Regions:
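Helix-to-loop junction immediately C-terminal to a conserved catalytic motif
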Residues: 63
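Conserved ABC ATPase signature
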Residues: 145-149, 153
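Conserved ABC transporter NBD signature motif
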Residues: 71-78, 91
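Conserved structural motif at the start of ABC-family nucleotide-binding domains
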Residues: 17-19, 32
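Catalytic Walker B motif of ABC-type/P-loop ATPase nucleotide-binding domains
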Residues: 170-174
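The feature captures the beta-strand-to-loop junction immediately N-terminal to the Walker
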Residues: 48-50
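Conserved ABC ATPase "signature" region
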Residues: 123-141, 189-192, 240
């Protein structure tokens, strides 16, 4: 799936999301060193790096599972570094876990239950639920228990639930992992749909091609720090990124 001739002018907009000099150590061992990055409104940014490079730690810091030793996390000009995890969604942060994170109930009730927690009025709750069922192609699954959904169907349900809170910044953790190529293309389509709502998306994936099909830019983590950043073409010209992470994927 290619974006075609989309013209990107994100730099003229003020960043909606920023990391400023994020550092983290565990038991005296540095995991992240002065990580800085930014996303602009409507931008899709990839986060790449080999296993153990600190991607999961960085995500956990952003969502509030871990606390950075130093640095700031800024969303919509607000420093959320000290804000509890359960409050961050209210400030415009959405997160899709790599794990199968759905309730043991129907697809419809998975969505309606979240709507009832965050939206006032039963009529509006049902309206939003129906809208999301339509937009994420879930209407035919509305009465099906989420535990029997396929991997791609679960990803669509999880993405639909994220949109209930109308986030400005969304973290997607391996949303295309362990999916067939045809299903990957389908998930890419829905990621671009989320972007069309004006959301900024930070996304990880072990398959570089999957990311480069949809991202505007990417950051590469290595040696506890950012070793490369830029458009996919710029990343592929980085000798450090090629040596550390890409191997033979793009040598031809």
């Amino acid at each position: 799936m290619k974006k075609g001739f989309r013209i990107i002018k994100f730099k003229k907009n003020k960043p909606v999301f920023e990391l400023k000099d994020i550092s983290k150590s565990f038991d005296g061992r540095p995991i992240l060193k002065k990580i800085s990055m930014e996303m602009h409104p409507g931008e899709i940014v990839g986060l790449l790096g080999p296993n153990g490079s600190g991607k999961s730690t960085l995500y956990n810091i952003i969502i509030g599972q871990h606390t950075a030793d130093k640095g700031k996390i800024i969303i919509n000009n607000k420093d959320i570094s000290e804000i509890p995890i359960h409050e961050r969604a209210k400030l415009g942060l959405g997160y899709l876990s790599q794990q199968r994170s759905v309730f043991n109930m129907s697809v419809y009730n998975n969505l309606l239950g979240i709507c009832q927690l965050t939206i006032k009025g039963a009529d509006e709750q049902r309206r939003v639920t129906e809208k999301l069922l339509d937009e994420f192609n879930l209407q035919h699954l509305r009465t099906i228990n989420s535990n029997v959904l396929s991997g791609g169907e679960v990803r669509r349900l999880m993405m639909a639930r994220i949109m209930i809170n109308k986030p400005k910044v969304i973290l997607l953790d391996e949303p295309m992992a362990a999916l067939d190529p045809i299903v990957v293309q389908d998930i890419q389509k829905y990621i671009l749909k989320i972007q069309s709502y004006g959301c900024s998306i930070l996304i990880t994936d072990h398959q570089v091609r999957n990311l480069f099909d949809i991202v505007d830019r990417a950051y590469v983590l290595g040696e506890q720090s950012i070793i490369a950043d830029g458009t996919p073409n710029e990343i592929l010209k980085s000798s450090k990124a090629i040596q550390l992470y890409f191997g033979n994927q793009y040598t031809n």
